[in-house]
Each structure stands twice: as structure tokens, then as C-alpha cells.
A protein has these predicted regions:
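Exported/periplasmic ABC-transporter solute-binding proteins
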Residues: 24-301
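N-terminal targeting leaders
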Residues: 15-16
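C-terminal motif of bacterial Sec signal peptides marking the signal peptidase cleavage site
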Residues: 19-23
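Bacterial N-terminal signal peptides that target proteins for export
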Residues: 2-11
Length: 301
């Protein structure tokens, strides 16, 4: 009986061992994927995710992981070597360039798209257009009632982005501007929200509200109104979107003044699959993704 049991155990082992060995190996034909990490601008998250999806359809051997967190967060990750690509809706700051140099990082800049920053209000707002100066005075707290700019007699609720946001930085520098060489700051009454989507939702619920963000997030929405913006009192008013579509020409030719490039930064010149992905982004196929996502493609050369 003991011999029969021993024989049974032996046969069982002969069956199990090949199965265990097979389970520890990759199936024949499996290829280890190249992983590319992308981090940064919340303005660019949806666009970057779509780029990644379209590229991975063509290159299943590559896995691209996209996260947001803000332009500053993405740049910090690049400088700490925890991401291959930093998305940013602003250029690198001098302090960031110094930090990069001290860490042996050589940031390379890629212009990948353009974006208009829309100023949005509730659809029931009586205000349709503002000058840059009025927008600055509103967000700095000089103007606190809609009546001062042709609206109803009610207080203005300010909604803005967190200070790690490239949109926050750009809007502060180019819209709030400077007085006597000193940077104008946001009103302390500004309600800070994490991400453009959350800001849009807040304004959509608040008839007294005003906010700002990438036009691609708002162009197709009917629960917020995009204001027309004038450079000054004597200038025509332009909107970055009409009939739920982004107006490329107004941004390309500078008529809509609150606009900017969107950037990707890498550590040194991209090589291998990383270069191939960056080439895809600025290719006609990649720029078509920009259009479909309601951002502004690079001007045709």
C-alpha cells in the first residue's frame, strides 16, 4: 500500500511541476512594455490622455501613464526624475531652471498646442463682455459687485485655481498684470478649486460666480457662459469660442489676447520610444487629436 501511495505522489508531482514552471514564465510572444510617465498640467490632462490612447493603439508595446496635479507638480516631478514628461501650461520659471541645473537636469521644451483661457460666468449673468482691466479689477478685488460692470446689483463670487496651476500663474501674470512694476495679486476672497472641471461646476451652480480656465473645457458646455473679452474700452470684444466650437483663428492671430502655448518638458532630448511619442504629438495625427479635444493646434508652417 505504501508503495502505491508513493507512486501516486510521484505521479502527482510529475503533473504539477511542469504546470508550476509554465506559470512562472511569460507566455511565448509576451513582450515587456516600455512605460512612459506623463505628469503635470490639469489643463492638459484630457488632451494628453487622448494622445496616449491614440499612440498606444498604434504601439501596443508602449504603456503611457498620464496624471495631473498642476504644472508646478509636473515640473517638480521632472526635476526629481519621477516622470519622463512634464506637461505645463506655462514656461519654466527661472528658479526651476536653476533647480534643474543644480540637479544635473537639462529640460528640453516642446510646444505641443495652444490654449485660450476663457473667462466664464453663469448663463443667467447679464454681463456678456469685459475689458482686460475689468477682469483684473474683479479678480484682484477692486470690483466686488456685478453692477459696476453692467450686471445685476449683487456681489461677485470669485473662483480660481490653486497656486501650483500653470493657469493660475499665467492668468495672474497676463491678466491681473502689474501696477508700477509690482505684480497684482488675487483677492483673498477667491475660492480656490482643484482643477478646471471643479471650477466649471462651481460657476455653473452660482449665478454670482466668475472663473477662468482652458477654453477646451468649456466650449461645448451650456451650463456656463464664456465672456467676450476686450483689450481696452475702444477695442472690439472677442470670445475664444463661438457656437460651442473653439475659434482657432482668433487665437492664432492674437485677436483673443488671453492665450498661450502648452508645453511638454523632457530631461534632455527625447530618444527611443519617448522621442517617437513626442514626434507623434506634433505630427498631423497628433495635432488632429488637439482639434478633436477642442484645443488649438499649432499654427501651420
Amino acid at each position: 500500500m505504501r508503495k502505491e501511495n508513493q507512486l501516486g505522489y510521484l505521479l502527482l508531482l510529475l503533473v504539477l511541476i511542469p504546470m508550476l514552471i509554465t506559470g512562472c514564465k511569460k507566455k511565448e510572444g509576451d513582450v515587456e512594455k516600455t512605460v512612459i510617465t506623463v505628469k503635470g498640467s490639469d489643463t492638459m490632462v484630457n488632451l494628453s490622455q487622448k494622445w496616449a490612447e491614440e499612440y498606444m493603439k498604434l504601439h501596443p508595446e508602449v504603456s503611457i501613464q498620464v496624471t495631473g496635479g498642476g504644472s508646478g507638480t509636473g515640473v517638480a516631478a521632472l526635476l526629481n526624475k519621477t516622470t519622463e514628461i512634464a506637461n505645463s501650461s506655462r514656461e519654466l520659471k527661472p528658479a526651476e531652471l536653476e533647480d534643474a541645473k543644480s540637479k544635473g537636469i537639462t529640460p528640453v521644451t516642446y510646444q505641443v498646442a495652444l490654449d485660450g483661457i476663457a473667462v466664464i460666468v453663469h448663463p443667467k449673468s447679464q454681463v456678456d463682455n469685459l475689458t482686460i482691466k475689468q477682469v483684473s479689477d474683479i479678480f484682484s478685488g477692486k470690483i466686488t459687485n456685478w453692477k459696476a460692470v453692467g450686471g445685476a446689483d449683487m456681489p461677485i463670487t470669485l473662483y480660481g485655481r490653486e497656486n501650483s496651476s500653470g493657469t493660475y500663474e499665467f492668468f495672474k501674470e497676463h491678466v491681473l498684470g502689474k501696477i508700477d512694476g509690482k505684480q497684482v495679486d488675487y483677492s483673498p476672497a477667491t475660492q480656490v478649486l482643484q482643477g478646471t472641471s471643479a471650477l466649471g461646476e462651481a460657476v455653473a451652480r452660482d449665478v454670482k460666480g466668475i472663473g477662468y480656465g482652458g477654453v477646451g473645457y468649456f466650449a461645448e458646455r451650456n451650463d456656463v457662459k464664456i465672456l467676450h473679452i476686450k483689450k481696452d474700452e475702444n477695442s472690439p470684444a472677442f470670445s475664444p469660442a463661438e457656437n460651442n466650437k473653439v475659434n482657432y483663428e482668433l487665437i492664432w492671430n492674437g485677436d483673443y489676447s488671453i492665450s498661450r502655448y502648452l508645453y511638454c518638458f523632457t530631461n534632455g532630448e527625447a530618444t527611443g520610444k519617448l522621442k517617437d511619442f513626442m514626434d507623434f504629438i506634433i505630427s498631423p495625427e497628433g495635432q488632429n487629436v488637439v482639434r478633436t479635444m477642442e484645443y488649438i493646434p499649432l499654427p501651420m508652417k
